């Protein structure tokens, strides 16, 4: 029988998996790597009122830190998450940032789908678009408020395309009616996976208005990298996990988190200036291709 020799165990969050991997590595006398893609308890705190004050939340955080300390090396998804580990006593020399990335061959600058553009009556409009889950921490209510301010100021120059579904859908639809934005906002609901690219092609500006919650400060989604690779103008809130991705004014725009007025101002600047939109979109794609393809990021692990 041929035996396959392993020299390390690589485990991904959360601590339930990571601690098992670290202990197994110790028992076998080999190295362990713990990859922290997020803190489960932080996500739960956005869904369960009062959870962040519970013993389970406190224990989960402590066990995440202990797992990182036990492991020989730790990868974190953001610099902000790395900084938290260092503050909690994990030695900085054994932590590397392993960020999200994108396949730049899959996400490219595409021509707009003219049939869908006509169907949605988006012709000659600048399209602000979000594709993803409708959950509280994404801040889509802030986006609606910003679009209301924007519409009052610049009129009928843009449309807001919201593709997806989730817990806040009803609240967002109600807010749209209350703000009298029915002619501006299009809700598609959930769409088939093979149709997503058609909707994505219509988007000029991709806002990520995540709220100033701890989970948003520490964890980055895939969405910003996909938007940048596609040549969209990324407009993110100033939460650390997103702001560290963008060079403000060059590869995207950053607005003050939880501030719809500042978001409206940033959106206005790129709606009114096509040249600026084009420049930022091209810069964003170039930066992602040169720094955040999966091929490049995976070499840090290998």
Language model features by range: what are they?
Residues 1-5:
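Short, small-residue-biased leader/transition segments that mark boundaries at the very start
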Residues 6, 72, 184, 200-217, ...:
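Acidic donor-binding loop of glycosyltransferase active sites
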Residues 33, 205-208, 226-229, 233-236, ...:
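Short hydrophobic beta-strand element within catalytic cores of glycosyltransferases
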Residues 80, 101:
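Carbohydrate-associated surface elements
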Residues 122-147, 161:
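Conserved donor-binding/catalytic core segment of Leloir-type glycosyltransferases
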Residues 125, 184, 262, 269, ...:
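A short, well-ordered alpha-helix in the C-terminal region of glycosyltransferases
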Residues 154, 163, 170-195:
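Nucleotide-activated donor-binding/catalytic signature segment of Leloir-type glycosyltransferases, i.e.
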Residues 248-249, 253-260, 269-275:
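Conserved acidic donor-binding segment of nucleotide-sugar-dependent glycosyltransferases
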């Amino acid at each position: 029988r041929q035996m396959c020799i392993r020299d390390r165990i690589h485990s991904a969050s959360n601590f339930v998996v990571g601690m098992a991997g670290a202990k197994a590595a110790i028992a076998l006398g080999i190295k362990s790597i713990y990859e922290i893609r997020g803190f489960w308890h932080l996500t739960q705190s956005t869904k369960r009122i009062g959870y962040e004050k519970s013993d389970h939340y406190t224990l989960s955080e402590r066990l995440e830190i202990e797992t990182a300390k036990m492991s020989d090396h730790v990868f974190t998804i953001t610099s902000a998450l790395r900084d938290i580990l260092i503050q909690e006593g994990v030695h900085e020399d054994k932590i590397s940032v392993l960020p999200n990335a994108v396949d730049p061959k899959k996400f490219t600058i595409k021509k707009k789908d003219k049939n869908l553009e006509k169907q949605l009556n988006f012709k000659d409009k600048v399209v602000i678009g979000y594709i993803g889950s409708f959950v509280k921490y994404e801040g889509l209510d802030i986006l609606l408020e910003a679009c209301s301010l924007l519409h009052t100021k610049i009129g009928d120059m843009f449309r807001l395309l919201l593709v997806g579904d989730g817990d806040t859908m009803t609240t967002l639809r109600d807010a749209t009616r209350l703000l009298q934005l029915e002619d501006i906002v299009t809700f598609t609901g959930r769409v088939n996976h093979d149709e997503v690219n058609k909707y994505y092609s219509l988007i000029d500006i991709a806002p990520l208005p995540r709220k100033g919650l701890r989970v948003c400060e520490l964890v980055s989604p895939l969405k910003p990298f996909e938007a940048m690779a596609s040549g969209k103008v990324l407009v993110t809130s100033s939460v650390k996990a997103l702001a560290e991705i963008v060079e403000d004014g060059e590869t995207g725009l950053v607005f003050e988190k939880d501030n719809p007025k500042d978001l409206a101002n940033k959106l206005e600047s790129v709606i009114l200036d096509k040249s600026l939109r084009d420049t930022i979109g091209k810069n964003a794609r170039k930066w992602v291709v040169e720094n955040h393809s999966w091929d490049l990021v995976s070499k840090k692990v290998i």
